[in-house]
């Protein structure tokens, strides 16, 4: 996104860590962000602390900038607190690749907060290393940019309520209703 105007800025949100807000009015269909992942792991590696101990320092630095809740959201112990925190950050901020057991994290896209009523949607590009974020409905300047953490593939049926609740368990969210534009 180097050659594009940034239409968002990152801010501290009072109740949910950091997030993105629009720097100007954004209209439906408009591109917000196109970004390459910086780390991809399969589901078994995403649970292996030794993988996080061996990460390249540049990747560790990028991962360390993502959200890390104080409560423990990882269901196993480790004696290495730094790697444990990186593991928690990966697990909290990862996005699944469609139809695969691989998950990835991004420097900026991973900062977009969840909403049961999203105003942007995300999709993987064909190369499966790049994701785009586009506007679902008009977003006013200063309004938070939010997405649903449930992948809504245009070819798939909308998940049933109990499926949506299970999908959101890792983040401890409960959506009582969903609105998709």
Spans of features found by a protein language model:
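C-terminal SET catalytic tail plus cysteine-rich post-SET Zn-binding segment of SAM-dependent SET-domain
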Residues: 114-181
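Short, structured beta-strand/loop micro-motifs enriched in basic residues and often containing a Trp
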Residues: 7-17, 122-131
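Residues embedded in well-ordered secondary-structure elements
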Residues: 15, 101, 164-166
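Generic detector of ordered secondary-structure context
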Residues: 18, 24, 82, 104, ...
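Catalytic cores of histone-lysine modification enzymes
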Residues: 30-122, 170-176
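Conserved SET/PR-domain catalytic core that frames the SAM/AdoMet-binding pocket
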Residues: 12-45, 132-156
